[in-house]
Curated annotation (Swiss-Prot):
Ubiquitous. The gene is NAA10. InterPro entries: Acyl_CoA_acyltransferase, Ard1-like, GNAT_dom. Keywords: Acetylation, Acyltransferase, Cytoplasm, Disease variant, Microphthalmia, Nucleus, Phosphoprotein, Transferase. It comes from Homo sapiens. This is N-alpha-acetyltransferase 10. Component of the N-terminal acetyltransferase A complex (also called the NatA complex) composed of NAA10 and NAA15. Within the complex interacts with NAA15. Component of the N-terminal acetyltransferase A (NatA)/HYPK complex at least composed of NAA10, NAA15 and HYPK, which has N-terminal acetyltransferase activity. In complex with NAA15, interacts with HYPK. Component of the N-terminal acetyltransferase E (NatE) complex at least composed of NAA10, NAA15 and NAA50. Within the complex interacts with NAA15; the interaction is required for binding to NAAT50. Interacts with NAAT50. Belongs to the acetyltransferase family. ARD1 subfamily. GO terms for molecular function: N-acetyltransferase activity; protein N-terminal-serine acetyltransferase activity; protein-N-terminal amino-acid acetyltransferase activity; protein-N-terminal-alanine acetyltransferase activity; protein-N-terminal-glutamate acetyltransferase activity. CDD domains: NAT_SF. Catalytic subunit of N-terminal acetyltransferase complexes which display alpha (N-terminal) acetyltransferase activity. Acetylates amino termini that are devoid of initiator methionine. The alpha (N-terminal) acetyltransferase activity may be important for vascular, hematopoietic and neuronal growth and development. Without NAA15, displays epsilon (internal) acetyltransferase activity towards HIF1A, thereby promoting its degradation. Represses MYLK kinase activity by acetylation, and thus represses tumor cell migration. It catalyses: N-terminal glycyl-[protein] + acetyl-CoA = N-terminal N(alpha)-acetylglycyl-[protein] + CoA + H(+); N-terminal L-alanyl-[protein] + acetyl-CoA = N-terminal N(alpha)-acetyl-L-alanyl-[protein] + CoA + H(+); N-terminal L-seryl-[protein] + acetyl-CoA = N-terminal N(alpha)-acetyl-L-seryl-[protein] + CoA + H(+); N-terminal L-valyl-[protein] + acetyl-CoA = N-terminal N(alpha)-acetyl-L-valyl-[protein] + CoA + H(+). Changing S37P: In NATD; reduced N-terminal acetyltransferase activity; impaired interaction with NAA15 and NAA50; does not affect cytoplasmic localization. Pfam families: Acetyltransf_1 (PF00583).
Length: 235
């Protein structure tokens, strides 16, 4: 099972999933409105064959008088794939994206008063709180619970995770820098010392300097080749 960000080509299959699972249905343009306006916030669950078995359709509320907050427009999981934790994972992923992309402080939704399974998920698992009852919210006249989930704790956890990740990155970089500095301060290898001695000998000699230079160049070339081969075999 895979959960990923919804793409434009997923929207028609999301609508099909909605029609199978929920009485609250939307025109295709409403899915495109979400997908194009807030592409980071909607997610789908797909099976091993890449078939969509669940989705969450989410957006940010555009209220200048309130703190930044998101809204879950629709959540659905096909009956064949329920009780696998997909709804919770979809909701958490959408909430996390709201925090990371828009600094959301809370997320809201509406749910039918008669939908006990959804109420249990929202209240007991996802820590949503009922904020008010909206009479006759649905087309058939049923009341809705307006619910909110505070995202402060999730935001703090994400922040700590990023801090630990950044700290770990600095530790790795520090170790690399120390290793480079240690290598730079180490004494020359036996091969390098040998080449230096031969170079000095060539400078001190008179008429034989040309021959010694040729010998030195030949030896240096051989040393480099041998060193390369040893390195390859060691790796």
């Amino acid at each position: 099972m895979n959960i990923r960000n919804a793409r434009p080509e997923d929207l028609m299959n999301m609508q099909h999933c909605n029609l199978l699972c929920l009485p609250e249905n939307y025109q295709m343009k409403y899915y495109f409105y979400h997908g194009l306006s807030w592409p980071q916030l909607s997610y789908i669950a797909e099976d091993e064959n890449g078939k969509i078995v669940g989705y969450v359709l989410a957006k940010m509320e555009e209220d200048p008088d309130d703190v930044p907050h998101g809204h879950i427009t629709s959540l659905a999981v096909k009956r064949s794939h329920r009780r696998l934790g997909l709804a919770q994972k979809l909701m958490d992923q959408a909430s996390r994206a709201m925090i990371e992309n828009f600094n959301a402080k809370y997320v809201s939704l509406h749910v039918r008063k008669s939908n006990r399974a959804a109420l249990h998920l929202y209240s007991n698992t996802l820590n949503f709180q009922i904020s008010e009852v909206e009479p006759k919210y649905y087309a058939d006249g049923e009341d809705a619970y307006a619910m909110k989930r505070d995202l402060t704790q999730m935001a703090d956890e994400l922040r700590r995770h990023l801090e630990l990740k950044e700290k770990g990155r600095h530790v790795v970089l520090g170790a690399i820098e120390n290793k480079v500095e240690s290598k730079g301060n180490s004494p020359p290898s036996s091969g390098e010392a040998c080449r230096e001695e031969k170079g000095l000998a060539a400078e001190d000699s008179g008429g034989d300097s040309k021959d010694l230079s040729e010998v030195s160049e030949t030896t240096e070339s051989t040393d480099v080749k041998d060193s390369s081969e040893a390195s390859d075999s060691a790796s």
